[in-house]
Amino acid sequence: MREKLGDSVEIMKERLEDMNMGSGLRRLLIAIVIIYCLITLVLGYLWSSEPESFSVQQNANVLAEELGIEPVIGFTTSVTLMKVAETMLDKSGGYLSNDLLLPGIWLDNIPNWEYGVLVQVRDLSRALRKDFSRSQSQSTQDKDLEIAEPQLHFDNDSWAVPSTESEYRRGI
């Protein structure tokens, strides 16, 4: 009887040790999940702010100086289009509309802001290509705008090959 009782006690001790090992693993997993959630909350807070505004004229003047050219009619518009598109891609957190993981999927305001910027960029690039790049009624279009405008109309949710960001950068 004592042997059976001793065996039962040993079995109970082994089971308790097994449960404690599982409890340690469970605690570790819970700690990892909590840390991950805290990191994503902090990143979400940092990424949810809109980028700084910029002076359109000052931006055009700086770029004209860097390129060593005299700005012509339409230069400021073109440079601003490029700057707005670059700002959308290079802001804090990058381009979030096609994110599949946290915290990107939690942030709905910034992807909506990005979509608004994208609509403006698409509309202006199309207007530049179709209307402004043609001299009066000539059928020839600017070659760079012929390439850029379709790139900026790429699917805004694509995250695989090719990524949305890479297609937009090619358009810029």
Residue ranges and their predicted role:
Residues 29-32, 40-172:
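Mature extracytoplasmic or organellar-lumen-exposed domains after removal of signal/transit peptides
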Residues 18-36:
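N-terminal Sec-pathway targeting helices
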